[in-house]
């Protein structure tokens, strides 16, 4: 079974879905403590025509509930930040709620999570790029993939097609997780190639995704 293209190493703790027909909707209904699951044998859904090395970034408009949509970019050194990240405290994504649990590292259940990490495109307080995500989603789920892409670009000066899609169930204000896809362009995925669903969960906490209310399990 394909987990990664040659030369591409996944972060530890992956859960392979196996059946390439298993979709994101199926993953949303699954439970468990894994940070992410592999989709479509780890092959992203980009087309041949998508594989262009011209840098760009696109962030979908917020919907009627104030929720983010797809964030999509061809990432290269041209887009990466040249200064430290500023404050994002003025942005309150859909479902934003400040709540603490003593057993969570940093205490806070929710973070303002960038769909495309600041280290990749230097987008900071962009409301179209920030969701309400758990500490676990942010640090254990998304960050290892972001770091992998950033390190690859810095080392090779190549470009990576990168797309993150928040998945909401109905009118929920908090997404169930995010679909992350990436593929390196110049080497046709030999360096970076993944397609994963990262769960917006926090071990030990039950989350009401419709409202963002929560309680310790």
What positions do the PLM features span?
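Domain-level detector of nuclease and nuclease-like folds
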Residues: 46-217
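N-terminal, intrinsically disordered, polar/charged segments of Gram-positive cell-envelope systems
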Residues: 10-55
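C-terminal motif of bacterial Sec signal peptides marking the signal peptidase cleavage site
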Residues: 3-7
């Amino acid at each position: 079974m394909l987990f990664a293209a040659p030369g591409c190493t996944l972060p530890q703790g992956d859960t392979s879905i196996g059946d390439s027909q298993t979709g994101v909707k199926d993953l949303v209904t699954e439970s468990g403590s894994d940070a992410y699951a592999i989709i479509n044998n780890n092959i992203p859904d980009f087309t041949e025509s998508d594989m262009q090395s011209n840098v760009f970034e696109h962030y979908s408009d917020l919907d009627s509930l104030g929720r983010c949509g797809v964030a999509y970019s061809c990432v290269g050194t041209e887009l990466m930040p040249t200064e430290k990240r500023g404050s994002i405290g003025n942005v309150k994504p859909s479902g934003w709620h400040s709540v603490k649990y003593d057993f969570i590292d940093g205490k806070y259940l929710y973070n303002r999570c960038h769909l495309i990490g600041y280290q990749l495109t230097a987008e900071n307080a962009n409301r179209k790029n920030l969701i309400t995500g758990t500490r676990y989603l942010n640090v254990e789920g998304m960050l290892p993939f972001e770091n992998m892409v950033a390190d690859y670009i810095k080392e090779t000066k190549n470009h990576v097609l990168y797309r993150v899609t928040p998945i909401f169930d109905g009118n929920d204000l908090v997404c169930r997780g995010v679909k992350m896809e990436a593929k390196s362009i110049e080497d046709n995925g030999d360096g970076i190639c993944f397609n994963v669903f990262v769960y917006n969960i926090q071990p030990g906490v039950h989350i009401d995704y419709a409202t963002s209310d929560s309680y310790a399990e």
